[in-house]
Amino acid sequence: MSSAAPAKKPYRKAPPEHRELRLEIPVSRLEQEESLTDAERMKLLQQENEELRKRLASATRRTEALERELEIGQDCLELELGQSREELDKFKDKFRRLQNSYTASQRTNQELEDKLHALASLSHSWIFAIKKAEMDRKTLDWEIVELTNKLLDARNTINKLEELNERYRLDCNLAVQLLKCNKSHFRNHKLADLPCELQDMVRKHLRSGQEVASPSPSPSSSLSPGAVVPTSVIARVLEKPESLLLNSAQSGSAGRPLAEDVFVHVDMSGGDPASPPAPGSPNGECCSVSTAGGSPEEELPLPAFDKLSPYPTPSPPHPLYPGRKVIEFSEDKIRIPRNSPLPNCTYATRQAISLSLVEDGSERAHRSSVPSSPASAQGSPHHQPSPAPSALSAPASSASSEEDLLASWQRAFVDRTPPPAAVVQRTAFGRDSLPELQLHFSPGHSTAPPPSPHRERGLVLPAEPDSGFPQDEEEEMLNLPVSPEEERQSLLPDKEGTEEASGPSHVDGRAWPLPSPSRPQRSPKRMGVHHLHRKDSLTQAQEQGTVLS
């Protein structure tokens, strides 16, 4: 009994499922068991064994259930493990493929990077080339703009120069026409200073006058180079027999074309082709063109030059007639018409129109007052004799001629219409003044002693050409006109002499024949030798390039 007491306090408390359910026997029961018998004790132990067996069976059942659950869980875990292994294999395959694709993409990226680097270098070069091309294009645009501006400036300059050239050409043509009609009052010309053709013309006129006066030629009629030719003689030689009209119906024989626009020289070889050639010419004197042993073409008389047209045929300039440098006009008889059709023309054109109107009016008035003479009708071999106009048709013809003159100048210089062929082939100088000049320059007039300064129409030879007298003393010895008034008085006869219709008039003891109606009295302004300057000055101006500057 004493051994059962220490069992109440075990060393370690077991878990609740393993604990034994010991019923505490009360003290009263223990006291009762002590008093029980063995039989009763056996029954009590058997009951306890059965209870233990029941408990063992329930524990076994529980253990089996746990084993079954463990087996079921193990199978599930094995299935899950297989599935996870399969998934792992799949993931490994995917990883392998991804690694291969990554390697391939890496190689591709490297190649693309190389290509991009190459393209970048090319793009840099292209960008540089594009920038350079743009700069070149901008430079070319600037150059094009500058060249365009220069071209426009050059075109404007060319247009202005063409206009100036056209105006200068027309002015020069008009100046040539006016200079051949205007007279110089400022100097007397020596024979050696005149052009060759003008020397021949002066000789032929003087020779023809001497032949009319005395048929036998005198040996003293030869001219020396130092002989002073009065301006009146040159004016008579160069005087035009017809008015300066571009629309006139009269036209001469077809002659040679004009030498140049700037200056038109005159044909001086209209005399006798069979005349003997002049001997060796001295210093400054020109020889005749035709010779005895020349060709038949050279021996034929050259026709007179055509009248200057507004648009002459250009040809190489004549060596004896270079261009002029300065052209001046006198304004004594210059007037501008009220109803002028040329308000925008040049000064020279207006002068020519006004001068032509003035001289045309004086010409018609003189023709109506002076009857016709047979000498004037036979003077010009190039023009047919026209019948004398009646006094009734004078006013109508004057008005129509003035209108025709203005219309002709408008057609020539405003509309720029080319002149007709008849006007182009018109001769510049007729020969109807030969009989009058023959009477004026007869040997009696040329050798008679001059009683007054008005008698300078004959050619006066100096006594000593090689003497050392100055030019002024020589001109005083030759009794030449000193002032333009004296020369004008010598050229224009007095009114008393012109009013007499029959017979010559006497002025200062000299007989002046009445001019013919076909060649009326001209103003000194219409007779000019402005273009007859010294050859040295003309040559110097031509060499220096200052001609018509």
From Swiss-Prot:
Pfam families: Pilt
Composition bias, Basic and acidic residues: 14-23, 485-498
Biased composition range(s): Polar residues: 369-383, 538-549
Record-listed Phosphoserine modification sites: 295, 315, 340, 483, 537
Localization per Swiss-Prot or TrEMBL: Golgi apparatus, trans-Golgi network; Cell junction, Tight junction; Cell membrane
Low complexity bias locations: 389-400
Bilayer topology: Peripheral membrane protein
Tissue expression notes: Widely expressed including in adult thymus, heart, lung, liver, small intestine, kidney, spleen, testis and skeletal muscle and in embryonic brain but not detected in adult brain (at protein level).
One BP annotation, GO: Golgi organization
Cited InterPro entries: Tjap1/BEGAIN, Tjap1_dom
Function, as annotated: Plays a role in regulating the structure of the Golgi apparatus.
Subunit structure, interactors included: Interacts with DLG1. Interacts with ARF6 (GTP-bound form).
PANTHER family named among the record's database cross-references: TIGHT JUNCTION-ASSOCIATED PROTEIN 1
Record protein name field: Tight junction-associated protein 1
Organism for this UniProt entry: Mus musculus
